[in-house]
């Protein structure tokens, strides 16, 4: 699997993501800087977490307007898989690649802890390694992860199977509507999620529940 990791000022989870992709796919990803307007031929583009541009204006608002984003939008339109984690999710929403909005946590506090996720849709290219309804562990670390969508949008994404993960067993850390933790686009090649699967992929992390997300994409691409 050929992958690419986007690097922007303020993102600080790029090294974690690079390490995860390298360990699982066996190939180190290429890195893409904010000013680049062309992206190499890759199977997966990842926008990692952090605080791009200091979260000024809104989380992800400035990053979504950088030159590299148009290149990502173009690749997504051609079916290339795109994953946004934490701030990456916020950027994808701001760029219009995913529906809804991400607001300040209902507690008005930064939350950093382990939560539980239910696999709501196990038929996506990112979740095939999991079972439908499976509950997995995953860490979160964010201040603005409260997912919201208006009634029409919510009905559409629920009806279309675009909700991929929900916070489970009462562990919703941010007040997200319907406990939504991850959504994808209608086409199914763009996924955004607040939890950090890259930080739970091996025994040294205390578990490997996040590994299935990357393994799923790898298996689909290799098929």
From Swiss-Prot:
Cellular component GO terms held in the UniProt record: cytoplasm
Pathway annotation: Purine metabolism; IMP biosynthesis via de novo pathway; 5-amino-1-(5-phospho-D-ribosyl)imidazole from N(2)-formyl-N(1)-(5-phospho-D-ribosyl)glycinamide: step 1/2
Positions annotated as active site in the UniProt record: 86, 196, 198
Primary localisation category: cytoplasm
InterPro entries given in the database record: Class_I_gatase-like, PRibForGlyAmidine_synth_PurQ
Gene Ontology MF terms: ATP binding; glutaminase activity; phosphoribosylformylglycinamidine synthase activity
NCBIfam families: FGAM_synth_I, PRK03619.1
Listed name of the protein: Phosphoribosylformylglycinamidine synthase subunit PurQ
Record organism: Rhizobium johnstonii (strain DSM 114642 / LMG 32736 / 3841)
Gene responsible for this protein: purQ
